[in-house]
Amino acid sequence: MKRIYSYNNQEHILYLVATPIGNLEDMTFRAVNVLKSVDRIYAEDTRNSKVLLERYDIKTPLYTYHEFNKELKEDEIVDFIKKGASVAIISDAGLPVISDPGFDIAKRCIKEDIPVTPIPGASAGISALIASGLPPKPFMFYGFLDSKTTKRKQELEALKYLPYTT
């Protein structure tokens, strides 16, 4: 992975941009600036993302990138970045990659020596932790539980014995 010495908006880069998790005013100045300056934004659900982009007068072209098309979109995104473009990935709420699309494209970009820069912001897991009254150390984020009841019960049973706030 390449070390980045400047955090000014760049070309040939993938940004993973955090979005608000419930209040549109939780959007950071930096996130707005990045989304205005990139060549394309790829979003989990463009219908949800349009509300955010309109709120901050972001006119950057918006494309879909989600669980069901990510394999098709990876080549498109990587090729676009290699031609000199900058791209941002956003999820519906919170941080891309964390229980949302983004891991595969970030991994691919790193493999191809394309810089990947996170633009931090709201995080549901950390927000819940700091308001919970539970010990913050050690802490483990597990992610979404399985949608199937039997599997979900098995996951919860295994998690309850961990020595972490989970």
Language-model features, listed with the residues they occupy:
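Beta-strand/loop-alpha-helix module characteristic of Rossmann-like adenine-cofactor folds
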Residues: 2-4, 11-12, 127-166
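Short glycine-cluster motifs
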Residues: 83-140
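Short active-site oxyanion
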Residues: 35-41, 113-117, 166
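Conserved helicase motor
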Residues: 63-72, 144-149
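Loop/turn-to-beta-strand initiation segments
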Residues: 13-14, 83-88, 164-165
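Glycine-rich, flexible N-terminal cofactor/catalytic loop recognition
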Residues: 1-68
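Short phosphate-binding loop-to-helix
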Residues: 67-82, 101
